[in-house]
């Protein structure tokens, strides 16, 4: 996209907003005729033709054949130009980073998975993220001017509108993390919560898209426990961007201190860290597991250990996971009673167990939810696995770049 077009769509003028609206229409519908655009904008055909011409000249859209219907002259179809711009998505995990690139049409062209990383709340750890993004740009011979936005998914409480992170990398309270990243990397940057990124990935390219649903709850069962909400085709952020704190609803009288500072949070009994604690305690209590040697050597269990043990059908780990599934299902039943979604997606590291966790969640949901509400809700395991966060980050980068300021 040309600098002039980018400047146009950034303006609050009617002309600029019309162009931005056309871009968003094509993001949602892939193609459109001139008549479609005229109707969408409530403008005349000549005005629509002028807008489409300027978008074409700006490198944003292109002709994509003709709509072959009826008789007479077939109308030209317009769609986004894949070479009109690129978007980088960054998914930050506890022990690695995934980085990917999509073009304007949403096609993924580069994916770098499993870049070693240690997530710590330090300036040094933040600098590593910046360095890896710059290395990705260099490695794939990308030009900074062609990158229209970068979106970084980060765990914790994030306000994507202001660009502030409230748990990690908040070293400069008066400066949004997004602006710090943008200054360091040299291009526009947005940030969002990791679970919302995963939810958006499944919504745009995964399970929700495959099933054609418009409302979905994404439950992220990983080291922590999070929730992403897609309501009527839109991410629900809440007033300050803090929606989805499922792991921190007060459920238990267990006196276990959560990292949020409260006691009795759902995450203290249902999460990867809770599973590590429970498995280690039961092994030390005399129960057998494939993880017994490591625990007795004094090693701390990691998520990868639990996932590997479940894949090997370790009875102790599967028993703990099934108990967690039943407890989580009870809380998901409450969410279904409140939101009545079309779909509940069970994702995250611990969901990749051949549907084992999902089965126990579903059994519990059927027990604790109202059947008249649940009967139209599907519960499915996420289809994208570890790719969900990266795909969501890429798609969020594109969505954020073209957000409309007024409807």
Regions found by a protein language model. Name each.
Residues 87-91, 147-151, 216-220, 226-228:
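Short glycine-aspartate micro-motif
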Residues 108, 165, 235-236:
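Hydrophobic "anchor" residues
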Residues 63-65, 189-193, 229:
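General beta-strand structural signal in soluble alpha/beta enzymes
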Residues 207, 212-270:
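Glycine-rich phosphate-binding loop of actin/hexokinase-like ATP-binding domains
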Residues 103, 160, 230:
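Short, acidic, Ser/Thr-enriched surface-loop or helix-capping motifs
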Residues 1-64, 69-72, 77-113, 117-145, ...:
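ATP-binding/phosphotransfer module of carbohydrate and carboxylate kinases, centering on a glycine-rich
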Residues 194, 222, 393:
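Active-site glycine-centered loops adjacent to acidic/histidine catalytic or metal-binding residues
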Residues 111-215, 356-367:
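Glycine-rich phosphate-binding loop and adjoining helix at the ATP-binding site
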């Amino acid at each position: 996209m040309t600098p002039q077009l980018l400047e146009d769509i950034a303006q609050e003028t009617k002309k600029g907003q019309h162009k931005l609206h056309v871009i968003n229409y094509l993001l949602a519908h892939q193609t459109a005729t001139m008549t479609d655009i005229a109707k969408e904008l409530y403008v005349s055909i000549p005005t629509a033709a002028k807008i489409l011409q300027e978008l074409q000249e700006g490198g944003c859209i292109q002709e994509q054949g003709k709509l072959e219907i009826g008789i007479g002259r077939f109308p030209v179809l317009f769609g986004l130009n894949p070479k009109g711009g690129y978007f980088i998505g960054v998914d930050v995990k506890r022990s690695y980073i995934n980085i990917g690139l999509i073009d304007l049409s949403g096609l993924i062209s580069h994916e770098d998975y499993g870049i070693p990383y240690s997530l710590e709340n330090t300036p040094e750890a933040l600098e590593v993220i910046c360095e890896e993004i710059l290395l990705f740009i260099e490695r794939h011979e990308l030009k900074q001017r062609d990158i229209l936005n970068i979106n970084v998914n980060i765990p914790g409480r994030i306000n994507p509108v202001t660009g502030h992170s409230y748990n990690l990398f908040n070293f400069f309270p008066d400066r949004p993390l997004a602006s710090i990243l943008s200054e360091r990397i040299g291009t526009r940057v947005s940030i969002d919560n990791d679970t919302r990124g995963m939810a958006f990935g499944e919504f745009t390219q995964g399970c929700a898209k495959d099933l054609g649903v418009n409302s979905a709850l994404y439950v992220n069962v990983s080291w922590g426990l999070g929730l992403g909400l897609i309501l009527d085709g839109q991410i629900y952020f809440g007033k300050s961007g803090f929606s989805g704190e499922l792991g921190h609803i007060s459920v238990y009288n267990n006196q276990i201190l959560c990292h949020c500072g409260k006691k009795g949070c759902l995450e203290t009994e249902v999460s990867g860290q809770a599973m590590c604690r429970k498995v280690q305690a039961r092994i030390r209590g005399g129960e057998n597991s494939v993880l017994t040697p490591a625990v007795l050597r004094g090693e701390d269990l990691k998520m990868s250990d639990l996932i590997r043990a479940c894949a090997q059908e370790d009875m102790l780990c599967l028993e703990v996971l099934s108990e967690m599934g039943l407890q989580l299902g009870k809380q998901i039943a409450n969410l279904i009673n409140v939101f009545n979604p079309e779909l509940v997606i069970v994702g995250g590291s611990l969901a990749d167990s051949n549907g084992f966790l999902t089965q126990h969640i579903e059994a519990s949901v059927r027990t604790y939810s109202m059947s008249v509400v649940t009967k139209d809700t599907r519960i499915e395991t996420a289809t994208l696995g570890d790719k969900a966060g990266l795909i969501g980050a890429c798609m969020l980068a594109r969505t954020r770049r073209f957000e409309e300021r007024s409807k």
